[in-house]
């Protein structure tokens, strides 16, 4: 089977894991005035890509993906625990747990994931999103680059949806923003695949946005 179908499936915003419920701090950045228009939105997203995702989140996921594909369950355990420990706020931790749980439910209801993958995923209580994403890649026979590119696109599509609902950003403007960010996605994905998973980074602005969102008076999203 052509792997493009599995990659599109994993990257789709229609994947029933609840990603539309979360803004990952972007709604707080809008409320605080850090993001005001398409230009400042692009700055925020590029910073997230370059300073957080490409340097820590994605390399960690890439390591977990590689371990999952070859069945190195000890390495999977270590990477999953590191991902869990790196959630800096209650909202970000809850987001990862909820989406991971939903993706595990989906994989348990479908036939593709093999017995070793099912057994490992069942031991994660609860699973985080990175752990479940890695098992989806194993189930649908995606390599690390394919599964990671699906993850990057899923993230970008979600962020654009948040902007269209809250900035507000029109559909055409959102597509223009997406076009300008595609080279950044390429660079971030390539850097993540090169970086060792043991390296790290810190995105203090994201953590602060997430913390302030917990007490934000009016909000549409859960993070």
What is each model feature region?
Residues 1-223:
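Metal- and O2-centered redox machinery and metal/ROS homeostasis
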């Amino acid at each position: 089977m052509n792997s493009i179908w599995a990659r599109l499936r994993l990257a789709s915003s229609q994947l029933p894991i609840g990603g539309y419920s979360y803004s990952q701090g972007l709604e707080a950045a809008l409320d605080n005035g850090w993001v005001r228009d398409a230009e400042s939105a692009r700055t925020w997203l590029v910073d997230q890509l370059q300073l957080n995702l490409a340097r820590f989140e994605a390399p960690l996921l890439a390591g977990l993906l590689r371990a999952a594909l070859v069945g190195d369950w000890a390495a999977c355990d270590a990477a999953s625990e590191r991902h869990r420990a790196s959630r800096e706020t209650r909202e970000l931790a809850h987001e990862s747990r909820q989406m991971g749980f939903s993706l595990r439910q989906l994989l348990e209801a479908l036939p593709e994931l093999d017995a070793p993958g099912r057994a490992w995923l069942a031991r994660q209580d609860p699973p985080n999103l990175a752990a479940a994403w890695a098992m989806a890649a194993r189930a649908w026979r995606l390599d690390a680059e394919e599964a990671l590119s699906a993850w990057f696109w899923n993230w970008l599509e979600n962020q654009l949806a948040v902007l269209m609902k809250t900035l507000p950003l029109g559909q055409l403007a959102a597509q223009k923003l997406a076009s300008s960010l595609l080279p950044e996605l390429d660079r971030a994905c390539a850097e993540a695949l090169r970086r060792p998973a043991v390296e790290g980074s810190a995105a203090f602005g994201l953590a602060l946005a997430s913390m302030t969102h917990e007490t934000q008076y009016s909000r549409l999203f859960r993070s």
